[in-house]
């Protein structure tokens, strides 16, 4: 079955180019932006990651259609290389998610074990009863102190906006996300470069 190679290759290379551009922007933002900004943008980043994954899947599908739906003399290797970008990226993401999940489970089990050992080593002790002398209060002195104490009123202008606190865990997560984005960029850039050079050289070097 023959397909319109001009259309399928255009869609494949365009989708791969947009996906590669999104990864490049993610890498630059991950290394240039402060950690507190990255933690605030975690939710939009997940949406962008889903869109990028969809573009990579579309690119691989059209590369496969261009390769397997074309005559034998038009089945160039760069189509296979472009088709493998999404599967390789998906395999890397799956391995990272599996390793991270195992690490989180081990950390949770370690925290639970430490919490159980702390509770076991510190039994609850009875609270000491207050002495009778300590319970006697001079009401006259207390009233005089209350009258002489200056009143402090907090106005709305004194409220300072609370900044987002960056924990070590969130900083480590941001650094890991930057490394993973850089790793994912390598096969995407290689596939895009091979596709562009392959399209350019189809009529010249075959």
Curated annotation (Swiss-Prot):
Segments crossing the lipid bilayer: 13-35, 51-71, 77-97, 181-201
InterPro entries named in the record: ATG33
Cellular component annotations (GO), alphabetically ordered: mitochondrial outer membrane
Protein's UniProt keywords contain Ribonucleoprotein: no
Transmembrane in keyword set: yes
Primary residence: mitochondrion
UniProt KW keywords: Autophagy, Membrane, Mitochondrion, Transmembrane, Transmembrane helix
Subcellular localization, as worded in the UniProt entry: Mitochondrion membrane
GO biological process assignments: autophagy of mitochondrion; macroautophagy
Annotated membrane topology: Multi-pass membrane protein
Family note: Belongs to the ATG33 family.
PANTHER family linked to this entry: AUTOPHAGY-RELATED PROTEIN 33-RELATED
Role of this protein: Involved in the selective degradation of mitochondria via autophagy during starvation and at post-log phase.
Protein name, as recorded: Autophagy-related protein 33
Organism: Lachancea thermotolerans (strain ATCC 56472 / CBS 6340 / NRRL Y-8284) (Yeast)
Record gene name: ATG33
């Amino acid at each position: 079955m023959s397909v319109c190679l001009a259309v399928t290759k255009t869609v494949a290379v365009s989708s791969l180019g947009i996906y590669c551009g999104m990864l490049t922007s993610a890498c630059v933002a991950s290394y240039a932006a402060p950690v507190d900004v990255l933690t605030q943008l975690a939710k939009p980043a997940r949406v962008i990651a889903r869109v990028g994954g969809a573009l990579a899947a579309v690119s691989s599908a059209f590369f496969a259609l261009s390769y397997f739906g074309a005559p034998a003399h038009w089945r160039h290797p760069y189509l296979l290389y472009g088709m493998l970008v999404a599967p390789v990226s998906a395999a890397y993401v799956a391995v990272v998610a599996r390793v991270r999940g195992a690490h989180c489970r081990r950390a949770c089990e370690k925290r639970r074990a430490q919490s159980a050992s702390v509770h076991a080593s510190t039994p609850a002790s009875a609270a000491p009863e207050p002495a009778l002398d300590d319970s006697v209060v001079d009401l006259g002195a207390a009233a005089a102190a209350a009258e002489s104490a200056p009143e402090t009123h907090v106005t709305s202008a004194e409220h300072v906006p609370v900044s987002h606190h960056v924990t070590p865990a969130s900083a480590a997560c941001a650094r890991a996300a930057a490394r993973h984005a850089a790793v994912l960029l390598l096969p995407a850039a290689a596939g895009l470069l091979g596709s562009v050079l392959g399209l350019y050289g189809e009529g010249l070097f075959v």
